[in-house]
Amino acid sequence: MENEEKNKIKSQELTQRIGKNGDRILRENLDDIGLANEINHEVIDLINRLRVYGVDIKKVFSECGRDSTLKTEIDRNQAMNIVSRFFYKFGIDVSKLLEEGKYNNESGQTVYLSFNKEVKRNETTSPTFVGEDVHAYAKETGTLTDVYSLVHEISHTLYVQNQFGEARMILGEVIPQCMERMLDSYLVELAERKENDVDIGTLKKDITKRKISTAIDRFRLTSRIAKGEYKFASEKAELSRYMLAQIYATQLMESDKSVRKQRIFEFIEALKSNDIQKANDAFDMKIGKEHTKERARYVSNSIWNLQKDVLTFQGNEVSKEKRDETTRTISEEENELEI
């Protein structure tokens, strides 16, 4: 009991120290509040623009909310098979974890997975010290959501082998969101090869819905930073993690397909070694507050992608004239970004 109490105190002290230093990095290096204000302003402009184009914003938010259900039905075995094959494309074998709910990673760390209908929320524990067990939880719904949930939570287990640090604190949501976006095209490939008995039209709409749902969630959290809706620095840091994940994932998907996988591996290694600069270099990110032009471009790309996805999702309900007008506007914005 005495050792447990000592370990608990050491864990709390380390977490507090990392938390203070991480908050300093967010404030002084990244200016997370300034970035949140910039994003929030662009989101408000986007909402107004979409209304002009005839998009029913309330309907989109309702259909693509955080708890929205995807229509494509996927049973438990199908979900695990898809996820196993997806990670195998990266040279990562998660078959034992999926089949047995437990495996030891290359560091000897034990990773547990609970994937069932009793799980209340999707989450993965973040160990403080080397060697501590990792527990991932994914709720089973019988839909395509399960595939995304499993990919997201298992991705969290790929970089937590070492001691908790500032890189994991600030950038810990990046890899799971990037893997979700890599999953999008993989699912379409499977459907086109008819390897899964799914309606490809419904699948594509579900994929777009998932992308919108994630973006809406991230931008809502960003809005909380901009509005000062947090009590503690640790709470703001948690919000910033999700804000940055949206930006970094967008940046990865802007890169050439041939380099994405390698960039993900380099980013994972940077998180393991607690090297924020190395992580930024892996994605060719210049996110520091001194890089105003680059930051503006990252924000614009994120907003542009959400606009494109919303218009795709609501395409049949927006008049052709409005869609043409929107396409012209998007093209103009894209050209401005390249200047």
Cite the ranges covered by each PLM segment:
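Contiguous, non-catalytic segments that form substrate-binding/exosite surfaces or channel walls
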Residues: 2-134, 314-326, 330
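C-terminal, non-catalytic "cap/extension" segments appended to globular domains
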Residues: 17-37, 59, 228-339
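Short, glycine/acidic-rich hinge or "gate" loops at secondary-structure transitions
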Residues: 54-61, 96-103, 165-173, 189-203, ...
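Short pre-active-site segment immediately N-terminal to the catalytic Zn-binding motif
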Residues: 71-74, 129-151, 164-165
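Active-site His/Glu-centered metal-binding helix of metallohydrolases
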Residues: 150, 154-158, 175
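Catalytic Zn2+-binding segment of zinc metalloproteases
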Residues: 155-167, 182
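An active-site-proximal "capping" alpha-helix that borders the catalytic cofactor pocket
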Residues: 171-185, 245-246
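Long, amphipathic alpha-helical stalk/connector segments used for oligomerization, subunit docking
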Residues: 185-263
